[in-house]
């Protein structure tokens, strides 16, 4: 119901205030979402198995296409014995340095109350950067890194499933024309079933990936038996000799080598789900040994037969096992794709809660796992873009050119944010922080440089996708800040309003009115409009603010603050982390059972009315945003999920009142 029919066309604005000071202390306070007691024994094994299914799907399916790209890609080298040993040496040391040394040993230590990922890292370091210019640079870098991850979420399902299904052309060349249609069918089904959630099949992800890793390890051992001299590739001298021999061409091959470490960022992003120890355990005990055995096996096949470079993975498989292996590879590719899709959903929720994205529909698909969510808007965009990529690029080799830029760009940005954590939070001296940062950047930028030359061959896609997403995220952030400043400047101080109410004593009616507001120090405009037009107030007025904290989750004991304001007014402040979804009715229902310092509140649903403001925005105000950005912000606002739906308010108990605002 609405008191202003014209308001239906405009966006609702419930301003998101800056994170409260509580976020400062919470970063180093007691553990919440991500921190857990160190897992041991069977618990460690179960978490490690789960990590195999979620964390290592992307990097685990890289053998399908990575080595092939190094020798047959746009910048591939001839599969001579010296080049094979050189490339395999680069593969071994890339995995060892980037994944084991950089991410597992250092980056995973930079957690936001146990949560990892680039937005969690941005939230952590942003509040500790005192210089405005430095903070703006961090935000730009973090947002662009997050934008690149969306591109990764589109490319990974496409290249993984394509790489798996391409085994058909090895098993039966006559089936080659079926590769793209089968891939499109699998991807369409995968995105279609997202709405039902993955709880039913999620339990098999870990076992599927364990079977996959065992299979590729066995295949690798089989290949090594052809020519065990491939094991010499662990010597770094072969990598050095490779660069000396191939010079610039050798540098460009890094664009293919980087494919063996795609998914490295997932180790960090999924840290909050499994913990550091299970992720490290799964990598060192299962994933890395299996991957290295398989890459060495592919290298041995290439030493034995250089013509195998056209598809060294499937040519490592004996003829009788080709079709079963295609099935296992496809299952593994689906698991890898699911992990990236779920990651995009989670990233979107973080962006919404941190104020970088409009409200979107977030549906929980599991009654037991809070992290299992479905975001229809993101699913539709990812699905359409992924299928379009398959139809446009048609092969994993063509897609490989597009893949590396998103991955290496994100890795370089993570390194820069890690440096701020080391300097500002850990108080590392310059002599300790800078050498490590420069070493990480040297490797990251080498990989990025080798990929940036592939812009015309497909690298344009992740850059274009990232630029598009970055524009949306940054526009929304700037628009929300400008809108909050506008409303804060025009707002009536709450204490002045309460003094006026105590003096004028307006007529009161039975029941409770809940007014949603983003600013705890001023009166919600919708309350002023209500009092001006209706001339009455409810017996009890609850001013409710939902605060988004820059931490993954808020401890239950710190969730709600209640304060008696006098004259029948009560202020309720509820805090949520960026991994949580606010539910206002559930929050109110929990109040009678909480130990609070303020007054006891018990709302009767049928006697409670929720009041929301719905503002029509015009791009003609004093904001310093460019006019095109204002128009884009207004379009995004109009298409955002309604505040009543996002906060879980009962539709038949909501009153919306509208006004015009010039941005």
UniProtKB/Swiss-Prot annotation:
It is found in: Cell inner membrane. It catalyses: K(+)(in) + H(+)(in) = K(+)(out) + H(+)(out). One of its GO terms (cellular component) is plasma membrane. The chain crosses the membrane at residues 81-101, 137-157, 173-193, 201-221, 224-244, 248-268, 283-303, 315-335, 373-393, 399-419, 433-453, 455-475. It holds the Pfam family K_trans. InterPro entries: K+_transporter, K_trans_C, K_trans_N, Kup. Coiled coil: none annotated. GO terms for molecular function: potassium ion transmembrane transporter activity; symporter activity. Belongs to the HAK/KUP transporter (TC 2.A.72) family. Transport of potassium into the cell. Likely operates as a K(+):H(+) symporter. This is Probable potassium transport system protein Kup. It comes from Anaeromyxobacter sp. (strain Fw109-5). The lineage of its organism: Bacteria, Pseudomonadati, Myxococcota, Myxococcia, Myxococcales.
